[in-house]
Each structure stands twice: as C-alpha cells, then as structure tokens.
Amino acid sequence: MSSRVLTPDVVGIDALVHDHQTVLAKAEGGVVAVFANNAPAFYAVTPARLAELLALEEKLARPGSDVALDDQLYQEPQAAPVAVPMGKFAMYPDWQPDADFIRLAALWGVALREPVTTEELTSFIAYWQAEGKVFHHVQWQQKLARSLQIGRASNGGLPKRDVNTVSEPDSQIPPGFRG
C-alpha cells in the first residue's frame, strides 16, 4: 500500500509511547508521523502546532471578501432525463441512446473508440423511421452499436470524414519509394 507522509520527522509507535514529550520537542514544525508495522498509523501534533492549524482553518473558512456572489450563477440546471418509452416502439426523431452507450456497446461486443456523432445518429434515426419497425430501447441501442461498427470498419473504427473539407497532402515518402 503506498502512502504519502506529510512531514520529514518519522518515529515508531514504540518510541512515541516510551517518551512522547522528547519526540514532539525534537519534531520540526511540531508534527511527527508515527509508524506502526512499517506503515503510517497517525500524526502526533504539539499543542502549539495544533492551535496554529486550527487558527488557519478558521481563517480559511471565512470569506476573503464581503462581496457575496449569487449561487444561481454557478448552479446549472440538471438535465431532465428523457423518458424512454416502455416496451417496443417505432423509431422517433428525438430518440437518444443512453449516456453510458459506449460502455454498453462494449458489453455487447462492439468496441467504439469515439462517441456517436450527430450525423451518425441522425442517419440511423432517419433510416429506421422510414422502416417503421418496432423494437425495445435496448434493441435500438444494439442496432445502433452494430451500425456504427459496420459503418466505421471501413475507416479504421473512426467516424467518417466530412467530404466537404479540403484535404492536405502529407509530405512523407512511403517505404520503397525514392523522393
């Protein structure tokens, strides 16, 4: 088990029990790490150092300014969970896979490196809306995972590139060619 010791002064528990006043008097900064069975057990702190630490904690607990900020500025509203229809249903335009879709896909044997893009999801929904078939939510997610697996297989498992972007030539010479 790894651990971090927060003081350079280390002593065994037996030495602390034998003469705690001398050990604490020699401690740099008023703190000693006490070890038992070669592992840190606790810290021994002098009363003066404890008073300093408590005063520091109290000072940090008080606001540094008298300006109070409105909590509403920092609290973002929770996203309302989308209700998934019970039982079988036909594909609809606002359908979304679960938030942990990539993990679920891995459980189904489909390793997805990238999350579903909006283009991929829109294409999937449009296709299955036209088909008019009905499946359970989990079955729709499995179909989406397989669809992504097949669609991305031709591109090394990544989403397809945008056909409207201008490609940049690379300047590397393939092995076996002279440049």
UniProtKB/Swiss-Prot annotation:
Highest taxon, organism lineage: Bacteria
Chain segments carrying region Disordered: 155-179
Organism in which the protein naturally occurs: Escherichia coli O9:H4 (strain HS)
UniProt xrefs under HAMAP family: DnaT
Gene Ontology CC terms, in alphabetical order: primosome complex
The name this protein goes by in its record: Replication restart protein DnaT
Family: Belongs to the DnaT family.
Keywords, alphabetical: DNA replication, DNA-binding, Primosome
Protein's UniProt keywords contain Cell cycle: no
InterPro entries recorded: DnaT, DnaT_DNA_bind
Function, as annotated: Involved in the restart of stalled replication forks, which reloads the replicative helicase on sites other than the origin of replication. Can function in multiple replication restart pathways. Displaces ssDNA from a PriB-ssDNA complex. Probably forms a spiral filament on ssDNA.
Pfam families referenced in this protein's UniProt entry, alphabetically: DnaT
Record's subunit section: Homooligomerizes. Interacts with PriB. Component of the replication restart primosome. Primosome assembly occurs via a 'hand-off' mechanism. PriA binds to replication forks, subsequently PriB then DnaT bind; DnaT then displaces ssDNA to generate the helicase loading substrate.
One GO process term, biological-process aspect: DNA replication, synthesis of primer
